[in-house]
């Protein structure tokens, strides 16, 4: 809710395998002051949003975790940010220190959870993502891309669905199906 209370249900979407490109694209675009493309992820108000296996580029800043409730969600593993690549931010601000958030807090989960903010656009190595206006971009990865391998789906937030099976059930004495 707008107050960030602990009321249920808690906003807790799970995003996986996204390529997210902001308006600043390859980092050469300058937008006017006051534009609304400052942060790729602004997690606030007790959200428990989780993001896995995602590549992000094209913003001034990367991940902003705002407020003690959101910090508690990270520490409690309700909010998970894992195996993501945040690349090519104009000012190098891949993580943002908000009130109550310290560099040690980010370090406690950033690298252990497989996140990377050191990769460059050249290392991501898209086929032809940043094209001239009117030319269709190609967001596939070239051979040798650092992002081509490494996705993982082992976190408990991912669930498995068992295949339906057949079982013998006794409906009444002596009869089975």
Outline where the language-model segments fall.
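Extracellular beta-rich repeat passengers
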Residues: 1-177
């Amino acid at each position: 809710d707008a107050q960030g209370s602990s009321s249920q249900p808690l906003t807790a979407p799970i995003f996986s395998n996204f390529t997210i490109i902001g308006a600043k694209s390859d980092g050469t675009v300058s937008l006017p002051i006051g534009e609304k493309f400052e942060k790729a992820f602004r997690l606030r108000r007790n959200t428990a949003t989780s993001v896995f296996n995602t590549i992000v580029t094209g913003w001034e800043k990367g991940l902003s975790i705002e407020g003690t409730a959101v910090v508690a969600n990270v520490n409690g593993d309700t909010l998970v940010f894992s195996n993501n690549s945040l690349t090519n931010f104009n000012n190098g601000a891949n993580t943002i220190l908000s009130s109550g958030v310290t560099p040690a807090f980010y370090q406690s989960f950033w690298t252990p959870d497989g996140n990377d903010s050191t990769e460059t656009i050249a290392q991501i190595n898209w086929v032809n993502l940043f094209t001239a206006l009117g030319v269709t971009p190609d967001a596939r990865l070239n051979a040798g891309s650092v992002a081509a391998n490494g996705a993982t789906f082992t976190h408990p937030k991912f669930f498995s669905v068992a295949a339906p099976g057949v079982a013998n059930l006794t409906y009444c004495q002596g009869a089975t199906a």
